[in-house]
Every structure is written in C-alpha cells, then in structure tokens.
Amino acid sequence: MTSLTVEMITFDSADPDRLAAWWAEAVDGTVNAVAPGEFVLVLRPQGPRLGFQRVDAPTPGKNRVHVDFTAPDLDQEVDRLLSLGAVETGRQDMGGGFRWVVFADPDGNAFCVGTGGD
C-alpha cells in the first residue's frame, strides 16, 4: 500500500521571487532561491514547502485547486494578511463555528483561512 505525503505546494508566477517573498511573510517562512527568477522555495517550520516557478503565461480562469489554512484567531489573521496585501474575495459561515475567508495573493491565486469548527 502506498502512502502519499504532501511535500510541496507549487505556484506558477511571472515573478517567483516576489511572490515567494510575499508568501514567506504570510506563513512565517524562509526564502530559499534555488534558481533565482526561475524556481524559489519557501521553507516552513511545519507542513509542506511552498514552491514558486516561473511561468510566463498564467493559466486563465478560476483556480481549480487552492490552499486552505487554519488560524487560532481568524479575525486577527485576516487583518494581518490584508495588511500584507492579500485581497479578500469572500466569506463563508457554515455554522457551528466553521467559517472561512477567501483571499487572493498578489498574483491572484486563491487561498482560504478558516476555523476548524466545533
């Protein structure tokens, strides 16, 4: 039986250095420019690494995959991400303490930050 482990989540970007720097700040990570301008990693204390690869033509349309994060204090994290330049694009409240906020990063990649619910 094979057991898969998430090693890295990779983002396409016209400017991987800039986007990696933004995400490093957002997730308290460290930038490792493997091939500056072409491929950059963000190393994190926990969880998968984030990769940023140069792609000159972004994929048009809505993201088919996005990253979900949790935060102990959702409102505080929303304020922090907005101050870094994230753009809030939506909110959901499913009841039972399960709610999340949808954002776009500086390249327009969707990601969510939410609570785990009760």
Q: What do these predicted regions represent?
A:
Residues T2-S13, N32-A33, V40-L43, P48-Q53, A57-L81, R99-A104, ...:
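Vicinal oxygen chelate
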Residues D15-T30, E77, L81-S83:
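Amphipathic alpha-helical segments
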Residues L19, G61, C112:
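Active-site-proximal flexible loops/turns
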Residues E38-F39, A57:
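Short active-site-proximal "capping" loops at secondary-structure junctions
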